[in-house]
Every structure is written in C-alpha cells, then in structure tokens.
Curated annotation (Swiss-Prot):
It comes from the Eukaryota. This is Probable mRNA-splicing protein ubp10. A zinc finger (UBP-type) spans 56-153. Zn(2+) binds at residues 89, 92, 108, 114. The lineage of its organism: Eukaryota, Fungi, Dikarya, Ascomycota, Taphrinomycotina. Signal peptide: none annotated. InterPro entries: Papain-like_cys_pep_sf (IPR038765), Peptidase_C19_UCH (IPR001394), Ub_carboxyl-term_hydrolase (IPR050185), USP39 (IPR033809), USP_dom (IPR028889), Znf_RING/FYVE/PHD (IPR013083), Znf_UBP (IPR001607). The keyword Cell division does not apply. PROSITE patterns: USP_3, ZF_UBP. Keywords: Metal-binding, mRNA processing, mRNA splicing, Nucleus, Ribonucleoprotein, Spliceosome, Zinc, Zinc-finger. GO terms for cellular component: nucleus; spliceosomal complex; U4/U6 x U5 tri-snRNP complex. The gene is ubp10.
Length: 502
C-alpha cells in the first residue's frame, strides 16, 4: 500500500510540473504576440507620419495684404449681413460668416484662393479651407490694430513724451491727433469724441479698463479712443462708424451720419447715456458714481425770484421782485454762456466789424451777483464746486419766429491760467485750499458757416493742445495741421474744454 501511495504522489508531481511548463510557455507566447502587435502599430504610425505632409505655420501668410485691412467698420458679413461669428479675410479685407464647410468664408477661400482669416471676436487666426489655427508672431501687429492695449507706463508717457509714428504708407502722424472720417454729416460727432479723448482721467479710464461685460456703447467708445491713441496704426486716420451705429440705435436715429446736429446737444445726450451705461447713478457733491461725473460734473446754486407787476389807474406799471427767494443746487456737466446781442444800428463803417467780448465777461452770469430775467423770473447763478474739467458752451444760435439767427461775436480768452475763483463760492475755495481755481485751455471747437448756392452750411472743427510739446493741432475730419497759438482766438468758439492746472 505504501508503494502505491508513493507512485501516486510521484505521478501528481510530474503532472503539476507539466502544467507549470505549459502555463509559462503560454504566457511567453501571449507576451510575444503583444510585442509583435505593438511593433506593427508603431511601424504603421511611422509610415503614416512619413506619408502625411507637415503643414507649416507660415503657409499663406505671405498673401496677407495689410494695406487693404480696415477694422474700423462694423463687423458684419458682406454676404449674409449677420454679425455672428464673423471672420475677416486678411487678403482682401472683407468680412464673412463662419469657417465651416458650408460657410461664406469657406466658399470665399475656395473661389478666391484667399486662405488667411481672423475671428473678429477672439482674434484667433485660421487658414481655410483646411480650417487649422495659426499661431505666429508675425500676426501680432494685426491683432494689436484690431484691439489696441496699453500699459500704465505707456499711458503715463502719453502726455510727457513726444511721439511721432508712421503708418504703412510711411506717412507720419502724432498719436491722439489723427483725422476722423466724415462718412456723411457726422462732423458734429467727430469733434465731440476728439474732445473727450483728450480728457486725461476719462481717456486713461477707457485705455486701461476691461469692458468685455459692458454695454456695446462703452465697448465701442473704448475701442475708438484706443485707436485714436494707437502708435502702431496701419493708417493715419480712424473711422467712427461702429460707434455711430450704436449711437444711432440708442438715440432712436436722432443722432446719425445722415443729418448734422448741434454738437452741444449731442454732447449732453452722449455723456448722460454713457453715465447710465457705466452703471452711474445720481451723484452727490461728495461722491461721483462714474468717470463722467468725476471728470465734468459740478454744482451750481440757482436763486429764483418771481417778478410781480403793480399798477394803479393812470399810473405807470411797476415791476417788483417777490420777497420769497427759492434756492436750489443743481448739477451740471457743462455751462452755457450767453453772448451779448449784436448792435441793432450800424453805420457804413461799422457794418463789417465783428464785435468782441472777453470770456470772463460772459462768465459773470455765474458770479452770484449778476441777474437774469426771463419768463417772469429773476435768477442768479453761482458755482458751488469746481470740477477737474469745465466745458463751456458759447451760445451762438437764437431761434425766433422766422429763422435761426447766428451771433458772430468773437470771444477772447487766455490760453493758460484762467482764474475761475470770481465765479466759485468762497466756501468751496476755503474748504479745499489745495485745489487750484486756475484752468488751462485743452480743446476749442470752432463753428464755421459757409454759403453755397444761397444755402448756408455749418462746419465744425476742433483745435487741441498737445501737452507733451505744447503745440496746437487743428483737426477737421481727415485734415490735421499744426497751427499757431495765435490762431486759437480768431474763430467762432462754440465749445471749450478747460483743465484744472496742477
């Protein structure tokens, strides 16, 4: 029995050894198959890599024509007129929708052999019809022209370091003092935007902040101001078409390129609308709620007194002021200055003489002593605060029952250190001894009347000081020229911008 057990144990041991050998061989065979599969896959990938051409990042970039690129106009597809997913062709400058196989940009690439496009929203560059993205430093200048950006150091240098730049045609221009396209009748619009673009805190705010989540009016104004101050521009002028389109929509077509308007009316509407778009609310003297109110808003005290008439039978009518005087403090963004009426009688020698008046004389309206009588009320005005910037509107047009009469009186003024203290309340001056009451002229909007074929046309141009060189430039639409400071006082000043001296 013991011999049989030993034989059975030996037999089991041999069977287990045979099984272990079979399992090892099986694992080796499986591992070998896996290695062969991996080798085959790698060989196939190498073959595919060798047969597939490598697409260069610089392919088609030499077809880009920067002289035809104009990103100032509204980003709308030239075929479907939609403003969604718009791409700009960098060969011809036209706008097309999408980049998929059924898009207008795709068909344009096939039919016109134009291959390089940029997404107008993301500023990413693509090659069509292959539809792959291109990342090249050679395209950064195009992205910068589409959406200029500024650093704090660059903004600080704008008013202290003289700059002279050149466009693609090697035409020199001074950033900030470039022409603005008059599409039809929008010169009233151009001069107002130019003036606002030279208000330092206002300008710096729109150069440095991010407005991606703001209303379109704010975004388009920021882009336009940045393009005005762009020192890497492709051309030495800009077009306000995108901003005007938004203004036309918000104003219900009251302000557009089709009809010329009063610049001061547009300025008032634009500042108030912009204040609301920036989230501003009704401000107090101590706390402005937007950059608009911070830069321009002041407060004026108005004392109103009713005028009563007394008369007895057979006696002359006598007008006396009511004993009750109502006092209100109201905010303002600009001050209206009334010109003295033109002389009624003129002899043959005085007929061609244009009257003159000093700026401080027409500002006496706000000295708190001068009275103004209108519509049965006697009023006195006195400035309660002095904002960083004063905007003066010199009222030149008076409407009567028959026509609008223009007052050609020339206003004379100093260019620097104009003292506003006689018109500001003493309490403000005493409580703010460090705030200067002297102001320097920054911009002067001129009105010009031209008669053609018995019809009168009104033109507006602006004269702006360059603080880095103290030179003056006159801008009328696309025409920019350097002028002498003596020329500033010779025109019919319509709107003036004064900056508090530091």
């Amino acid at each position: 029995m013991s011999e049989n057990k030993d034989k059975n144990n030996i037999l089991k041991r041999h069977i287990e050894e045979d099984n272990n050998i079979d399992n090892g061989k099986r694992k080796k065979l499986e591992l070998g198959k896996d290695m062969e599969d991996v080798h085959d896959i790698a060989s196939k990938e190498m073959e595919e890599h060798e047969t597939t051409p490598i697409i260069s990042q610089n392919l088609y970039l030499d077809t880009i024509n920067r002289k035809l690129l104009d990103f100032d106009f509204e980003k709308v597809c030239s075929v479907s007129l939609t403003n969604l997913s718009v791409y700009a062709c960098l060969v011809c400058g036209r706008y097309f929708q999408g980049r998929g196989p059924s898009s207008h940009a795709y068909f344009h690439a096939l039919t016109e052999n134009h291959h390089v496009f940029v997404n107008c929203s993301t500023l990413k560059f693509y090659v069509l019809p292959e539809s792959y993205q291109v990342e090249s430093s050679a395209l950064q200048d195009i992205a910068y022209v589409m959406r200029p950006t500024f650093t704090k150091l660059e903004v600080q240098r704008l008013d202290h370091t003289p700059q002279l730049s050149y466009d693609l045609m090697l035409k020199p221009y001074v950033p900030g003092f470039v022409g603005m396209n008059n599409i039809k009748n929008n010169d009233y619009f151009n001069v107002v935007i130019h003036m606002l673009a030279h208000v330092k805190p206002f300008r710096n705010y729109f150069l440095l902040k991010n407005f991606d989540n703001c209303p379109q009016l704010v975004q388009r104004l920021a882009i336009l101001i940045r393009k005005l101050w762009n020192h890497k521009a492709f051309k030495s002028h800009v077009s306000p078409q995108e901003l005007i389109q938004e203004v036309t929509v918000l104003s219900h077509k009251k302000y557009s390129i089709n009809e010329q308007k009063d610049p001061v009316e547009f300025l008032s509407w634009f500042l108030n609308t912009l204040h609301n778009c920036l989230g501003g609310k009704k401000s107090t003297i101590a706390k402005p709620t937007s950059i608009v109110h911070y830069s321009f808003q002041g407060f004026v005290r108005i004392e109103s007194q009713k005028i009563r008439q007394h008369a007895e039978k057979g006696e002359q009518v006598v007008f006396t002021g009511d004993r009750v005087i109502q006092t209100n403090v109201v905010p303002f963004l600009y001050l209206t200055l009334d010109l003295p009426p033109k002389p009624i009688f003129q002899d043959e020698f005085e007929g061609n003489i244009i009257p003159q008046v000093e700026l401080k004389e027409i500002l006496n309206k706000y000295n708190g002593v001068h009275t103004q009588e209108l519509a049965g009320m006697r009023r006195r005005f006195h400035l309660m605060t002095a904002p960083p910037y004063f905007i003066f509107h010199i009222k030149r047009f008076m409407k009567n029952n028959y026509f609008t009469e223009r007052n050609q009186t020339i206003v004379t003024f100093p260019l620097d250190d104009f003292d506003m203290s006689p018109f500001i309340d003493d309490s403000f001056i005493q409580s703010n001894p460090k705030i200067s009451t002297k102001y320097n002229l920054v911009a002067n909007i001129i009105h010009e009347s031209v008669t053609h074929a018995e019809e009168e046309f009104h033109n507006f141009r602006i004269q702006i000081r360059n603080p880095s060189t103290n030179k003056w430039y006159q801008i009328q639409d696309l025409y920019v020229e350097e002028i002498s400071s003596d020329m500033i006082r010779l025109g019919e000043s319509f709107i003036q911008l004064w900056e508090r001296s530091s």
